[in-house]
Amino acid sequence: MIKQRTLKNVIRATGVGLHTGDIVYLTLRPAAVDTGIVFRRVDLDPPVEIKAREENVGDTTLSSTLVKEGVRIATVEHLLSAFAGLGIDNAYVDLNASEVPIMDGSAGPFVFLIQSAGIVQQEAPKRFILIKKTLLMEEEGKWARFEPFDGFKVSFVIDFDHPAFKGRPQGVEIDFSSTSFVKEVSRARTFGFMKDIERLREANLALGGSLNNAVVVDDYRVINEDGLRYEDEFARHKILDAIGDLYLLGHTLIGAFSGYKSGHALNNKLLCALMADKSAWEIVTFEDDETAAPILFTRPLTAA
């Protein structure tokens, strides 16, 4: 049986909110079977819990933001991407602020945190969402699509007419039945343009952004001293974002996702359209044969 997973231990980290610039204290906690990923604003009295589900996304400006009765938790996608990549089904995420810390702009620090906490299996079958038919969402020359596929495959194409992107791959496809999220995707950082950052700061956004947590591009080139971590880091980060957004379905996906210039808003519209079309998906488990699962996960340490 392929089992659900949670964390073995509580683990804490401190970081900065990308948009607020505030210091954020983050605590990841184990959770019981079928809890899902639940974010908690523990700075509020009483604390407010928001489940990481597509219907709770209330804002997609620059990030995926969970909203409940006016309470916001922004920039959840990189942490969710790490949970997805490591196959974590159940966890609590405690925050003392309205934003998940940006860390280094990738999912790498979250992967390290989760692996440091330890991963344990739980005595319940892991549930997957199986895509049964093609679903397409288009908007202003951009699109996002689900297709049936025996595994989990993500492809993404960006299209920037800019010197820093010339000669670099602007499209990438990764099949996670044969390759590792940790190795191929987790270290790809968010990126931004210098001209946009100045405009965002005037609007009190990107206040925590720096060369330590983003790839920054001026009019001609990448200005980070160490350059890029992958030749196609820009496109790979969009895959990282998409995996985080897709995990708002609440389960690991069996299917293919393709995006062309898509972002958090279009991704969320596709998720909502999928959930609304009951003929397009079904929940499946692998209770008899563990080798039948078509997705490669890092092996957990032990059973809970």
Swiss-Prot record:
The GO biological-process annotations, alphabetized, read as: lipid A biosynthetic process
Q: Report the pathway entry.
A: Glycolipid biosynthesis; lipid IV(A) biosynthesis; lipid IV(A) from (3R)-3-hydroxytetradecanoyl-[acyl-carrier-protein] and UDP-N-acetyl-alpha-D-glucosamine: step 2/6
Give the taxonomic lineage as stored in the record: Bacteria, Pseudomonadati, Pseudomonadota, Gammaproteobacteria, Chromatiales
Instruction: Provide an example Pfam family for this protein.
Output: LpxC
Which species is listed as the source?
A: Nitrosococcus oceani (strain ATCC 19707 / BCRC 17464 / JCM 30415 / NCIMB 11848 / C-107)
Its EC number(s):
3.5.1.108
Which of UniProt's keywords are assigned here?
Hydrolase, Lipid A biosynthesis, Lipid biosynthesis, Lipid metabolism, Metal-binding, Zinc
Give the family, as the similarity comment puts it.
Answer: Belongs to the LpxC family.
* Reactions that this protein is recorded to catalyse: a UDP-3-O-[(3R)-3-hydroxyacyl]-N-acetyl-alpha-D-glucosamine + H2O = a UDP-3-O-[(3R)-3-hydroxyacyl]-alpha-D-glucosamine + acetate
Needed co-factor(s): Zn(2+)
Q: What does it do? A: Catalyzes the hydrolysis of UDP-3-O-myristoyl-N-acetylglucosamine to form UDP-3-O-myristoylglucosamine and acetate, the committed step in lipid A biosynthesis.
Q: What is this protein called?
A: UDP-3-O-acyl-N-acetylglucosamine deacetylase
Family annotation (HAMAP family):
LpxC
Give the positions the UniProt entry annotates as the active site.
H264
* InterPro entries on file: Ribosomal_Su5_D2-typ_SF (IPR020568), UDP-acyl_GlcNac_deAcase (IPR004463), UDP-acyl_GlcNac_deAcase_C (IPR011334), UDP-acyl_N-AcGlcN_deAcase_N (IPR015870)
The residues the record assigns to binding Zn(2+) are: H78, H237, D241
Under the heading NCBIfam families, the entry gives: lpxC (TIGR00325)
